[in-house]
Structures are given as C-alpha cells and as structure tokens.
A protein has these predicted regions:
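Short loop/turn motifs at secondary-structure junctions
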Residues: 58, 135-137, 202, 245, ...
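Outer-membrane beta-barrel proteins
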Residues: 56, 60, 133-134, 144-145, ...
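Conserved, mostly hydrophobic/aromatic
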Residues: 62, 103, 141, 206-208, ...
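N-terminal carbohydrate-binding/catalytic regions of secreted carbohydrate-active enzymes
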Residues: 31-133, 273-284, 290-318
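Stable alpha-helical elements in mature extracytoplasmic
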Residues: 50, 86-90, 119, 123-127, ...
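Secretory targeting and sorting signals
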Residues: 1-30
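Substrate-binding surface in catalytic domains of secreted glycosidases
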Residues: 74-82, 147-241, 248-265, 303-305
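Flexible loop residues that form catalytic
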Residues: 67, 144, 211, 254, ...
C-alpha cells in the first residue's frame, strides 16, 4: 500500500545512528495549531530541513513521522532513535522559529506500539512518554498497517488508550489518520469510528489518506468524494450535522506521484483540494511529505513542480 513510506522507514532503520540528549523547549503558548496545517516531515531522506521549509514557505507546523515500537512497548523514532537527540533538536528549532509539531505514531512500515503494547494502559503509557518528552498539544495516530487497522483487538486497545490519554491530558488533541476508499472509510474504518463512539474515546479529528486508489483519475474529485464519505460516516455515528462533521474531518494527501502507477496529485489538484477543505472548514489539511516537495524523480515528487509548491499551499490554509 504505502510503498514510499515503507521504503523510507526501512532506510531509516538501516542507517539510524546514536544521538545525544538535549534540553527541549516547551511549545510556546502562542504557537500555531499543530493539527490544522502541518505537512509530514521525516528525518531519513529528501528535504529534511524544517528550518529551510519554514523560511521558504512560512509554514508553521509539521507532522513528524514516525513514532514506533522498539520491539516492545517503548516509543522510539522509527523504532530506533531515543526521544532525545536529533529529533528533539529539530523540535527545538521549529519552536524557536515560532512553530510547533505533532508527532505521528504508526505509518505503514515498522513495528507498531498498538500491536506490541499488551494493554490499553501500557499503550497510553507509551503515548504519555512522548507527550511528556515534548510537552505536546496534539498527537497523530496513523493507523494504516494491517497489524493495527485490520485487527479488532488492536483497534479497541488503541481507542481505550486514547480515552485514558485524553483523561490524563484534558487539553490534548488526538488525530486518527486512516486509509480510505473513494467513497470514504472501508469496513474497518467504519468499525474504528463506531468503536470510538462506543468506547467514548473522544477523538478530536478523523483524517483520511485519499490516495493509492487505482491507476489514475481526477485526484481532486476522488479526494472530495472520500472526505464526503468520512463526513457522512461521522454524521451517522455521532449524530452531527454536516458542518460539525466536516469540522471533525481532515485529509492527508500525497504530492505528485503516489504509490500506485499512473496516479498523480498535481499542484492544480492540490489547490482545488485546499479550496474544498477551506469551503468545509476541515480541521486538518496536510500531505506526505515536505521531504518530497521538489521537482523530478528520486526522493522528489516525480512531477514537474516548484520547490515547496505543496508546502506553500498548506502553509496558507487557515481552516
């Protein structure tokens, strides 16, 4: 499914180096909302400089990928790097420049905390270590790997851990990011949403990844249809009206060529998606990833585009 994410994470695991501890600055009280407009950024390839992206685009927040299991229930960046070191340094740099971050747990590749932590309380404890380490305002749970997504017991463990984490951190916002069909969440996605309601997990934002559908088509239209489907499921589950459901919805697109041959999100597509998101006041508008936000192949988007074209579009999103 998410081949580009898979390859990147495997590369990180192979090349991770030891890091040294640094002090971490807390999120500034006037810092931007890390949920709303925060493109994904990772440390293992492509354009990894948060400072360069902020200077070039005026983007103020990043979704940092990925927090994984070290083989047990201990959270580490890409499953290898401690919570101190280069990642903490980057968070300090982002905050010093007036920005903020939202770490993402999960992704496609690597060992997942949801699967390795044997209870909801243990998983909540793993989340708490990261929240405390970075004094976070929000976390993103990217539940796309089958070990977590297509597993009822793990889905419930994650949702119960969210409930416990929200109780301990009343101001924390939790985003759950899942894959989608063009019509909205599939059976497993619908189950996850319904279980969140049943458990009382109090998820703040539900975000779908509207790509890897097929081998082409109008990606702006596919994205709108997928998010409309998410909105409809939230209406059904929670009894919200359209406006409230949209304001609990979000999307995480992909710039340029996706993992599926022939499927491409162009800059024009992404602008249309931005306009749709703004028109419905979506709570989250992002993409994978600033690292790839450059022209051509290799570790770039695979299309002809200006450097940081997609990040600039996200930077201008105000909800």
């Amino acid at each position: 499914m998410k081949t580009l994410r898979r390859l990147a994470t495997l590369a990180a695991a192979a090349g991770a180096a030891a890091v040294t501890a640094v002090g971490l600055a807390p999120a500034a009280s006037a810092a931007p909302d890390p949920v709303l407009a925060s493109p994904y950024l990772y440390q293992w390839g492509g354009q990894t400089s948060a400072s360069a992206a902020m200077s070039a685009t005026d983007v103020k927040a990043f979704t940092l990928a990925f927090m994984l299991s070290d083989g047990g229930c201990t959270p580490k960046w890409d499953g290898t790097r401690a919570l101190t070191g280069s990642d903490a340094t980057m968070i300090n740099q982002i905050r010093s420049a007036g920005g903020d971050v939202i770490p993402s747990f999960g992704g496609w590749s690597g060992t997942k905390l949801g699967a390795k932590c044997t209870s909801a309380s243990a998983l909540a404890g793993a989340y708490q270590k990261v929240i405390d380490a970075y004094q976070l305002k929000a976390i993103d749970l990217d539940i796309e790997n089958t070990d977590e997504f297509e597993n009822a017991a793990v889905q419930d463990r994650i949702l119960n851990a969210v409930k416990l984490t929200k109780q301990k951190n009343p101001g924390l916002r939790v985003v759950i990011t899942i894959g989608t069909e063009t019509t909205g969440p599939n059976t497993w996605g619908k189950r996850l949403i319904n279980q969140a309601k049943a458990i009382g997990a109090n998820v703040d934002v539900w975000s779908v990844m509207p790509f890897d559908f097929s081998n082409g088509g109008d990606m702006a239209a596919h994205t709108k249809s997928a998010v409309d489907g998410l909105k409809n499921q939230l209406k059904t589950t929670f009894g919200w009206n359209d406006d409230v459901a949209y304001r609990h919805s979000g999307l995480s697109s992909m710039n340029g060529k996706t993992d599926n041959a022939g499927e491409t999100v162009t800059v024009a597509n992404f602008k249309a998606i931005r306009d749709y998101a703004a028109g419905h006041h979506l709570a989250r508008f992002t993409f994978w990833a600033t690292n790839r936000d450059c022209s051509g192949g290799g570790e770039c988007s695979g299309i002809s585009q200006g450097k940081y074209d997609f990040t600039k579009i996200v930077a201008g999103y105000t909800g």
